[in-house]
Amino acid sequence: MKFTNLTAKEFGAFTDSMPYSHFTQTVGHYELKLAEGYETHLVGIKNNNNEVIAACLLTAVPVMKVFKYFYSNRGPVIDYENQELVHFFFNELSKYVKKHRCLYLHIDPYLPYQYLNHDGEITGNAGNDWFFDKMSNLGFEHTGFHKGFDPVLQIRYHSVLDLKDKTADDIIKNMDGLRKRNTKKVKKNGVKVRFLSEEELPIFRSFMEDTSESKAFADRDDKFYYNRLKYYKDRVLVPLAYINFDEYIKELNEERDILNKDLNKALKDIEKRPENKKAHNKRDNLQQQLDANEQKIEEGKRLQEEHGNELPISAGFFFINPFEVVYYAGGTSNAFRHFAGSYAVQWEMINYALNHGIDRYNFYGVSGKFTEDAEDAGVVKFKKGYNAEIIEYVGDFIKPINKPVYAAYTALKKVKDRIF
C-alpha cells in the first residue's frame, strides 16, 4: 500500500463507488473549494495493483501566519471495517500534513456511532466503538459528543429513511397518519413538481427567507446555494412544488360532480326511509364536503386571477450522489402552507431516489436533543412521521501536529475568548 495524491478523476470514481460518501467528499466540492481560493488536497491510498482503496479531500487554512489548519469535511472515504487500513491511512495522513506546515488536523468522519428512534431512545450500536481507541492511539483528541447546531462543527445526528428493497407503496404504508394524508392530498390536489434552473433560484431563496423568519433559524447566504448549484452541477437538484390552477380547478369540479351525485342518492334514501339515521349522517357529511369543495374552487379561481395559472408554493435544495439523496434545506410560502407543498417536494425526491436505485434518503440534521422544547422539535416530528431512523455519528477529532505551537495557540485562543 502507498499513501499518495490522487487526481480528481481517481478521487471521484472511488468516492462514487463507496458507502458513507458525503457530498463534501466529491469532485464537485473539490472544484468549489478551488474556486473559493482554498488550498485543497486530494489524497488517498493505493494498493499494490495501483487501485484506490481510500480517499480524502482536505482543505488548508492559514493559522498564525506560518502554519495551516487542515480539515477533512466528513472524510476520509474508506472501508472502516478494515482497521489495518484505517490505521495506515491516518498515520500516513499525519506525516503528509506535517510536510505542509500543519499546526493541527481536524476530521469528522461520516462514520455511525449508534442508532436511535426519534424519541431519542437508542435502538442499536453501529459497532465502531473501536474507532475512538484507535484515534486516541494515533494522537487524535475526541472533542466530545456535542448536541445541537453549531456554526463550525458538523451536525452529529441525521434522520435517515432506508429505501433498500422498498417500493413507493411501502414508504406510504410506513408513514404516520398525517404524512399519509398530506402525501395523498398533494397527489390529487393539482400540486406539481419541477426542477428550478440557476436563473430561477431566487424563487427557492424567497421561500427560505419566509421559513427562516417564521421559524427563527439562521439560513445560509445566497452565495452558498448558487456556488453549490454551479460546481456540483447535476449533483444538486432544486425541486419546486407549484399549483397548476387549470388542473386543480378541473379536479375540484370533478370531485364536486361526484359529491353532488352521492348527495342526491342520500337524499333519495331519506325520502324512502326518513327514519334512516345513517342516511341523515351521510347527507350531513357529504354537504360538509361539498361546502369545503366550493370554498376550494372559489379560492382557486381567486388565486388564479391574482397569480396566473401557476403558483409556486414550496421548494427544496438537495444533494445527490450514488449513496444517498440529501434533503439539505427547504422552504414554503407562509401564505400557501395549507397546500402542503413541502410534502410534494419530499414525495418527488423520495421517488427520485427509488427510481435511480439510491437506497438512502437523508432528511439530514437534527439537534439530538429530542425534547419538546428543543429548537427543532417540530422538524423532528415531521421527519419521524416518515418512519426514518436517527444515525448518530462519531463526532470530531483533532490531532495537534506541531504540539508546542498548538499548545501556545490554544492558550492564546482561550485568553482571547475570555476577553471578547
From Swiss-Prot:
Top EC group: transferase
GO CC annotation: cytoplasm
EC number in record: 2.3.2.17
UniProt catalytic activity: beta-D-GlcNAc-(1->4)-Mur2Ac(oyl-L-Ala-D-isoglutaminyl-L-Lys-(N(6)-Gly)-D-Ala-D-Ala)-di-trans,octa-cis-undecaprenyl diphosphate + 2 glycyl-tRNA(Gly) = MurNAc-L-Ala-D-isoglutaminyl-L-Lys-(N(6)-tri-Gly)-D-Ala-D-Ala-diphospho-di-trans,octa-cis-undecaprenyl-GlcNAc + 2 tRNA(Gly) + 2 H(+)
Gene3D superfamilies hit by this protein: 1.20.58.90, 3.40.630.30
UniProt-listed Pfam families: FemAB
One Gene Ontology term of the molecular function aspect: nucleotide binding
Record localization: Cytoplasm
A single BP term in Gene Ontology: peptidoglycan biosynthetic process
Other remarks in the entry: Since cross-linking between the peptide strands is critical for maintaining stability of the cell wall, FemA is a potential target for the development of new antibacterial agents.
Quaternary state and interactors: Homodimer. Interacts with FemB.
Function statement: Catalyzes the formation of the pentaglycine interpeptide bridge, which is characteristic of the S.aureus peptidoglycan. Adds glycines 2 and 3 of the pentaglycine bridge, using glycyl-tRNA(Gly) as donor.
Protein name from the UniProt record: Aminoacyltransferase FemA
Organism: Staphylococcus aureus
